[in-house]
Amino acid sequence: MYSVYVPRETEEHKLKVRCKTARAVNNIDIYVPIEAVADEDVVGRAGKILIPAGAKIIGRGYCDAEAGRMLSRGKWTFYASDHQITVDATLWDQTLKEGLEGTQFSEALDQERIKQAIFRDGAYVYVPSQTEFILELQGNITVQDLPSAFEK
């Protein structure tokens, strides 16, 4: 395992990753998994690709009922070839507003479950698949080698 600390940087030097949701996101359940894919290569200052385009990304979101948005601040995991990269990140929309704005489309979900989400969180928030967003990385970055399925 390899771990690095990314020092606090000025706004223009913060590492930002353009992403797209791989499936719809909603607050039907308390735990809100966000599955995404990196839209473009993330290149470090030395010119090396740190995270390739197409890398799978997993994070956790939560509902902000007042704003009608899905927010996420915390751990995100990137899966790139044989590495698992864990980072602290904040989710921003394309206009650099924190979180993803929800829509009214419910994807024919059980209306009782939607009512439960409204009762629990104060709102039902749905974000469609293929929604573009930005992850702003900060703090610690941990890189872990994943074992091969073909090695003993």
Question: What is each of the regions a protein language model found here?
Answer:
Residues K48-L50, K56, Q84-D88, I134:
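Well-ordered beta-strand positions in beta-sheet-rich domains
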Residues E66-S129:
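Extended amphipathic ligand-handling, pore-lining, and cofactor/metal-binding catalytic surfaces
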